[in-house]
Amino acid sequence: MPASLLELKRKIASVKQTGKITEAMRMVSASKLNQTENRDKDYTVYNDHVRKTISHLISSQVVDSLRERDISIDKNNISKIDYTDVFGLGITADMIQPRKNIKTTGFLVVTGDRGLVGSYNSSVIKNMMSIFDDERAQGREVKVLAVGSVGAQFFKKNNVNVVYEKDGVSDVPTFDEVLPIVSTAIKMFLNGVYDQLYVCYTHHVNSLSSAFRVEKMLPIVDLDIGVKEAEAHKELEYDIEPDVNSVLMKLLPQYARSTIYGAILDAKTAEHASSMTAMQSATDNANDLVSNLTTKLNRARQAQITTEITEIISGANALE
């Protein structure tokens, strides 16, 4: 058999094997996607309830404080509130009160630990570099908490200040895995490492679509605190034991944990969806390549057979 035919056969066998591998990887990603997608949907409901509860608790205390001082309840007055007047000195007020003269912004950025996930990692990195440029243009220092080795390595190579990094998060992350990340993020904020913290990740929309998302985590503001007095009477009545500070001391760290865990779970779901799509595309390309190579092989065989028949006929004619 001519060398060209043998080479085509080897290529076909190699591409078929690659196609089997990518199809297996697609199936694994689909299985992981199914697990994280279901958990993500359930957890989103829980996280929304935690957020709503904290929003109402803070709002009710702010509204009561304004009432006691006969100050009108409007967004302008609410934006000027000093939360130490409402909650006293301590972690509760520190986690709620916006900082003045913000000099440093922290970003908790979630990427993956590996490639073969389409544009998942590159999209996050591209968006983050644009955000970093905007922050620096405003005279603010940027500090990054990187979850995922791809982002951490890229940022360090590009002279971004990475103050914390975490890799090896499970494909189906557990709540316990997130606790050290949350603890570090809160501690750095309270210690003044940064004046505000944003969580940046890829939000899973569906199997074919995702969206880059940036959420402010600390200080905990903009939780629908701007309520009307009528809404305050209707929605924000609480019987609190032993006191609001004690309740918020429990809820605020829970909110931080919920925000970060929800972001990582959502990001992992988007990563699995992107991986599944990428592997499906790779499998389809492998099948197309096998089809094209098989066509070339058949044509080469046909040409070889035609040549051999022509040679036989020519030889027979020469003997006559």
From Swiss-Prot:
Protein's GO biological process: proton motive force-driven plasma membrane ATP synthesis
Induction of synthesis: By low pH.
Entry-linked InterPro entries: ATP_synth_F1_ATPase_gsu, ATP_synth_F1_gsu, ATP_synth_F1_gsu_CS
GO molecular function: ATP binding; proton-transporting ATP synthase activity, rotational mechanism
Record keywords, A-Z: ATP synthesis, Cell membrane, CF(1), Hydrogen ion transport, Ion transport, Membrane, Transport
GO cellular component terms given for this protein: plasma membrane; proton-transporting ATP synthase complex
Membrane topology (UniProt): Peripheral membrane protein
PROSITE patterns listed in its UniProt record: ATPASE_GAMMA
Compartments where located: Cell membrane
Membrane spanning stretches: none
Function: Produces ATP from ADP in the presence of a proton gradient across the membrane. The gamma chain is believed to be important in regulating ATPase activity and the flow of protons through the CF(0) complex.
Subunit structure: F-type ATPases have 2 components, CF(1) - the catalytic core - and CF(0) - the membrane proton channel. CF(1) has five subunits: alpha(3), beta(3), gamma(1), delta(1), epsilon(1). CF(0) has three main subunits: a, b and c.
Identification of the protein by name: ATP synthase gamma chain
